[in-house]
Amino acid sequence: NIKDNIAPKGYFIGCCYDGNKIFEALKDSNIEFSDTHSEKIYSIDKKYDIDDFTFNPDNMDNIFGNTIDVYMESIGQIIPEYLVNFKFFRHYMEENGFKLVSPKVKGKYSNLLKQNNITEGFGDFEKVINNLPELAEQDKELQKGGYYNEAMNILKNTELNDDGTIKELGYEKLRLLSSFNNYFIFQKV
């Protein structure tokens, strides 16, 4: 559909979970995060039954139909989603006349698209999160008093009292959820 509906030199931009990261994380168990009142914030449950999610262009039986059930408290219901193998995705897009691009952005948002936030051509939210202190040095909006200063809270870890109870809940599980995401910019050639 996008092959027919995007003009030459037009863009296809998006964001979704990196299926390989989710696949690896779900090898041991499903993922769930609840707050200090035992209210579920999110969960990701494995619904597929494959042992390997490696992309092989000669045999793609393991690439399609790998469902996960995703619950987000803010949405209030379970939504089925599918694992996206980014090596397959790139291969498929290139076969259909698209190439991954990293636009040359100047000014305010240029730091987000720096090479140290990109993995194999895809924007990597995990790297953006890990690079937030560096980004904040250059972006006043991330600094104290800035419009996006609260985004820096995602770097806080849980603090415990001496008896091991939670003093202040950190953002490790939200950081994990965010780190599963990749963003991409394809241009039709």
State what each model feature region is.
Residues 17-19, 105-106:
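An acidic- and aromatic-residue-enriched active-site/binding cleft used to recognize and process polar
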Residues 31-189:
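C-terminal lobe and adjacent flexible extensions of AdoMet/dcAdoMet transferase-like proteins
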